[in-house]
């Protein structure tokens, strides 16, 4: 039942403009349809929606006696209190705003009602009468934003973008968009992967991994990109909470970046969609006209990070600090998830060119060697410190001596020592891989003590960088192949310990598309290039260190 909201709720909800564009109007009407349980929605735009806008659904419908209230301000059937928002629309403002801005026509019929109702409204004039009608609701808006010089094509683009976004969060909705009578979007409710092809393009959608994870009444589903796909902005990372599209909270974005830390270059973001299903106590919605901002509980944010890490482990893209174990013999497919790479050539004495199946790989030789050495160091550190052949004296400055009690993570994992007078300690144990370097040991101890590496992994990343083969160093075929074979034994071959990409992959179909050839027609047949929106830029090549 539609009812007016009490004054105290009206004041809290009266923030900002409701309708600024045709896209805003479509959003409000689409959310009403989804709240009504619609499984099919049809949107029609004439003159970009400025002349005429139609949204028709097969949802529950509005009873005849409630139609006049539907176009009154702050009248809604969806909200009892601010703590119980469970629908997409809740302010009771949308139809009233349309009534004030344009001519409004609503035809609706609940499934249990014999006949339907028709409402005609413009300004303060409202007329309601019974009419025959199919189940559901049809809203027609005429003359929206008249005389404002709007661009019809721009309005259509905005609506199309909006509908693709909503399909990522409601992939079982059958949705159609027509502009000037021409079909611009026909989606049969075919699921999330098909919705992703619409939103991201076919090529990018093929590089997304399905995500499904739940714990403690919290659940996340979605699609997220593999390491070879990234953006320098989080503008292709979409979030919804209980079906409501919302902006990514900063806290959650930090969690996502942390999960991808060893897979993506610094400053890069993944691509994809996350659909969160949470109880009311796990989030708080900001009450403004756009309804796009949300505050998530710590448990909800942690769930997403756990889900991503579990996915990466399952796909062999990432692994926590490994237990010591012997390396397994190399056999395709490898533990890394990569096929065995065949060395082709070295380019500019910095990059290795390799192939596997229908894919060409470009490998940064320094980043690859860093990753190999880093994972070897991780395994050796997991064995714990070993007694030094003879104790080693280390001199400490007063500020360094004061840090001994802080118990730095890297310090405790790498060394055992004992006080040996003021400003001195005697090293008793250290990782076996450091034993041959007695001159380096004091510096590593001090760096771990000062926490300059920030963590054990960061310190090991610095140690791996020093001996790694540098850009500009020539490698022969045997050396190049050995480096590639060693890379395939890594748990995370996609990125160096600092987060820069190790390799880029270019599939044969990408070459065919970019050269404008027909797929499979290697004899020289030409074809028109595919539309630009189907392509997606690879991550940029890493700079030389």
From Swiss-Prot:
NCBIfam families, alphabetically?
A: mutl
InterPro entries with a match to the protein in the record? DNA_mismatch_repair_MutL (IPR020667), DNA_mismatch_S5_2-like (IPR013507), HATPase_C_sf (IPR036890), MutL/Mlh/PMS (IPR002099), MutL/Mlh/Pms-like (IPR038973), MutL_C (IPR014790), MutL_C_dimsub (IPR042120), MutL_C_regsub (IPR042121)
| Protein's name according to its UniProt entry | DNA mismatch repair protein MutL
What Gene Ontology terms for biological process does this UniProt record contain? mismatch repair
* Biological role stated in the UniProt entry: This protein is involved in the repair of mismatches in DNA. It is required for dam-dependent methyl-directed DNA mismatch repair. May act as a 'molecular matchmaker', a protein that promotes the formation of a stable complex between two or more DNA-binding proteins in an ATP-dependent manner without itself being part of a final effector complex.
- A single GO molecular function term of this UniProt record: ATP binding
Record's SUPFAM superfamilies? ATPase domain of HSP90 chaperone/DNA topoisomerase II/histidine kinase, DNA mismatch repair protein MutL, Ribosomal protein S5 domain 2-like
Disordered as annotated region, ranges: 516-545
Q: Name one GO cellular component term.
A: mismatch repair complex
Keywords in alphabetical order, please.
Answer: DNA damage, DNA repair
Q: Which PANTHER family match?
A: DNA MISMATCH REPAIR PROTEIN MLH, PMS, MUTL (PTHR10073), DNA MISMATCH REPAIR PROTEIN MLH1 (PTHR10073:SF12)
By sequence similarity, the record places it as follows:
Belongs to the DNA mismatch repair MutL/HexB family.
């Amino acid at each position: 039942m539609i009812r007016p909201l009490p004054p105290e709720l009206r004041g809290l909800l009266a923030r900002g403009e409701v309708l600024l564009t045709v896209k805003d109007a479509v959003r409000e009407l689409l959310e009403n349809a989804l709240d009504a349980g619609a499984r099919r929605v049809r949107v029609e735009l004439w003159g970009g929606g400025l002349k005429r806008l139609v949204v028709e659904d097969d949802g529950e419908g509005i009873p005849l006696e409630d139609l006049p209230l539907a176009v009154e301000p702050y009248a809604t059937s969806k909200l009892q209190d601010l703590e119980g928002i469970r629908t997409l629309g809740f302010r009771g403002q949308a139809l009233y705003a349309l009534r004030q801005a344009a001519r409004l026509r609503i035809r609706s019929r609940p499934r249990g009602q014999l006949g339907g109702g028709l409402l005609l409204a413009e300004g303060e004039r409202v007329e309601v009468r019974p009419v025959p009608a199919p189940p559901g609701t049809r809203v027609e808006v005429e003359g929206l934003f008249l005389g404002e010089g709007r661009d019809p094509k721009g309005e259509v683009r905005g609506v199309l973008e909006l509908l693709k976004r909503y399909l990522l969060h409601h992939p079982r909705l059958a949705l159609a968009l027509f502009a000037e009578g021409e079909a611009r979007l026909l989606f049969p409710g075919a699921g999330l992967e098909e919705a992703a092809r619409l939103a991201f393009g076919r090529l990018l959608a093929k590089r997304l991994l399905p995500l499904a994870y739940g714990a403690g009444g919290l659940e996340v589903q979605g699609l997220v990109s593999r390491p070879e796909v990234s953006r320098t902005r989080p503008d292709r990372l979409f979030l919804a909470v209980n079906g409501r599209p919302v902006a990514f909270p900063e806290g959650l974005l930090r969690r996502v970046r942390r999960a991808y830390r060893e897979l993506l270059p610094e400053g890069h973001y993944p691509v994809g969609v996350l659909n969160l299903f949470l109880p009311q106590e796990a989030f708080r919605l900001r009450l403004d006209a756009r309804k796009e901002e949300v505050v998530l509980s710590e448990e909800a944010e942690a769930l997403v990070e756990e889900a991503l890490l579990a996915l990466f482990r399952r796909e062999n893209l990432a692994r926590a600090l490994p237990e010591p174990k012997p390396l397994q013999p190399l056999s395709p497919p490898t533990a890394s998830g990569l096929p065995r790479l065949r060395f082709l050539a070295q380019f500019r004495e910095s990059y290795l060119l390799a192939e596997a199946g229908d894919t060409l790989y470009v490998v940064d030789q320094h980043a690859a060697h860093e990753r190999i050495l880093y994972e070897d160091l991780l395994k050796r550190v997991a064995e714990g410190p070993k007694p030094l052949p003879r104790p080693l004296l280390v001199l400490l400055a007063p500020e360094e001596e004061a840090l001994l009690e802080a118990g730095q993570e890297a310090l405790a994992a790498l060394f055992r020592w004992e006080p040996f007078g003021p400003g001195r300690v005697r090293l008793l144990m250290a990782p076996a891989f450091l034993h041959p370097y007695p001159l380096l040991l004091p510096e590593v101890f001090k760096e771990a003590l000062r926490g300059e590496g920030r963590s054990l992994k960061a310190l090991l990343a610095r140690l791996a960088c020093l001996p790694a083969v540098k850009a500009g160093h020539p490698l022969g075929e045997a050396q190049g192949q050995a480096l590639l074979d060693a890379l395939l034994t890594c748990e995370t071959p996609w990125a160096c310990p600092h987060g820069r990409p190790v390799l880029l992959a270019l599939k044969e179909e990408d070459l065919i598309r970019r050269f404008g050839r027909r797929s499979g027609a290697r004899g020289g047949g030409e074809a028109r290039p595919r539309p630009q929106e189907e392509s997606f830029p690879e991550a940029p090549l890493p700079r030389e260190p």
